[in-house]
Amino acid sequence: LALVAHLATLRASVPFLHFFDGFRTSHEVSKIEMIDYEDIKKIVDVKDIENFKKRALNPEHPQLNGTAQNPDIYFQGREAGNKYYDAVPEIVEEMMKKVEGITGRKYNLFDYYGAKDAEKVIVIMGSGAEAIEETIAKMNKEGHKVGVLKVRLYRPFSAKAFVKALP
C-alpha cells in the first residue's frame, strides 16, 4: 500500500500519511515481495511528478504561503481546498487498480471478509486485521454470522464506499 499512497499523493496534491503499526508488524518474520522498479515506472505518471516539483519551494520562483488571516478569509481558503480532498477516494481506488495490475494484489478502500449474511461486523484498520480475519474464519465455521471490514483509507473517509463494502 506504500506505492498506492505515493502515487495517490502525487495525483491528488494532498499529503498522505502511510504507516505500519503495532507489535506484530515490528516483531514478526514475514516474507515480502518487492515490486520491480521497471514495473513501477510503468504506472507512475511523469506529469504528476512534474506538477509536484513545480509546487516545491524554489528561490527562482518565490511564492507566499502561510499568511496571517482573519477567520473569515482563512475559512474560505480551507473551503477552496475541499475539491482536492473530495477527489481523494476515487484517486486512491484508481491507484489501487494500477498497483493490482502489476502485482496482482487487490485492495479496495474497504475490504470485507466473512459471512454474506453477517449479523455482526468488526471494523478495523492496521496490523490486527489479519488476526481478526483468522478468527472470523473460525467463527463462521462454527456457525456464527460474523465478518470483518478492513479500512484501507481513513481520511478522507468515504461513507459511500464503507456502506457499499458491507454485506
Predicted regions and their residues:
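Conformationally flexible catalytic loops at phosphate/diphosphate-handling active centers
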Residues: 16-111
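Short, low-complexity, polar/charged sequence segments that are solvent-exposed and flexible
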Residues: 7-11, 35-39, 141-143, 166-167
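Internal, well-ordered domain-core segments that constitute the primary functional module
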Residues: 1-22
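Thiamine diphosphate
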Residues: 96-167
